[in-house]
C-alpha cells in the first residue's frame, strides 16, 4: 500500500513537472494524489473512491475503462473489436492519429471529456457503439479520471513507441 502511494505521488509529481514547463493553454493540469486515487478506482473498476458505481450507457456495474483499454491504457482487441490506446501522449499527439481508418486531430481535456461522457471523438465523430458513455460521472470524478489517465501516459513516455515526435 505504501509503495502504491509512493508510485502515485511520484507519477503526480512527474505530471506536474512536465506540465509546468509548457506554455500551451491546451496542456493538462496536474492533479493531487487523492484525486488520482479516485481516478484510478474509476478507471479500474467503474466505482468511485466513495463507493458509488458510475452509471454508463451499457448498464455495466463494477467494470471500468481498464476492462477494454487495459490497465496500462494501451488498448488492443476485445471480442474482435479494436480498442484504441488512450494514454495521454497518444491522444494528444499533434499529428493526430488514425483509428478504424478515420483520421482525427489531437485531443485536449475538453475533447477527452466529450469522448468519455458523450462518445464523441476529437474530430466530432461518434465513437464505436461499444464504447460506453459514462454518464454517471460528476465533474470532479471526470477530472479525477483524466488526472489518472495522465499518469498512464507519463509512466509510458520513455517507451520506444512513444519517443517518436514527442
Stretches with model-predicted labels:
Residues 1-10:
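Bacterial N-terminal signal peptides that target proteins for export
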Residues 9-18:
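Bacterial N-terminal signal peptides
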Residues 23-61, 101:
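Electrostatic cytochrome c docking/interface patches
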Residues 38, 107-122, 129-159:
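C-terminal capping alpha-helices of c-type cytochrome domains
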Residues 44-47, 67-75, 117, 121, ...:
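Detector for the c-type heme attachment site
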Residues 49-51, 76, 92-95, 122-124, ...:
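Short loop/beta submotifs within extracellular cysteine-rich repeat domains
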Residues 53-111, 130-137:
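Gly/Gly-Pro-rich "capping" loops immediately C-terminal to redox-active cysteine motifs
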Residues 158-166:
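Extracytosolic ligand-binding ectodomains
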Amino acid at each position: 500500500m505504501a509503495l502504491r502511494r509512493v508510485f502515485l505521488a511520484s507519477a503526480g509529481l512527474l505530471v506536474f513537472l512536465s506540465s509546468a514547463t509548457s506554455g500551451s493553454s491546451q496542456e493538462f493540469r496536474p492533479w493531487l494524489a487523492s484525486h488520482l486515487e479516485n481516478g484510478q478506482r474509476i478507471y479500474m473498476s467503474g466505482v468511485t473512491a466513495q463507493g458509488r458505481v458510475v452509471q454508463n450507457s451499457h448498464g455495466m456495474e463494477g467494470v471500468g475503462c481498464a476492462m477494454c483499454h487495459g490497465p496500462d491504457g494501451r488498448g488492443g482487441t476485445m471480442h474482435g473489436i479494436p480498442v484504441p490506446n488512450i494514454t495521454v501522449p497518444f491522444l494528444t499527439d499533434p499529428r493526430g492519429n488514425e483509428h478504424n481508418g478515420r483520421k482525427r486531430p489531437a485531443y485536449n481535456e475538453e475533447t477527452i471529456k466529450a469522448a468519455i461522457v458523450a462518445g464523441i471523438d476529437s474530430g466530432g465523430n461518434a465513437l464505436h457503439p461499444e464504447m460506453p458513455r459514462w454518464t454517471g460521472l460528476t465533474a470532479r470524478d471526470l477530472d479525477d479520471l483524466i488526472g489518472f489517465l495522465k499518469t498512464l501516459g507519463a509512466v509510458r513516455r520513455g517507451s520506444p513507441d512513444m519517443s517518436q515526435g514527442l
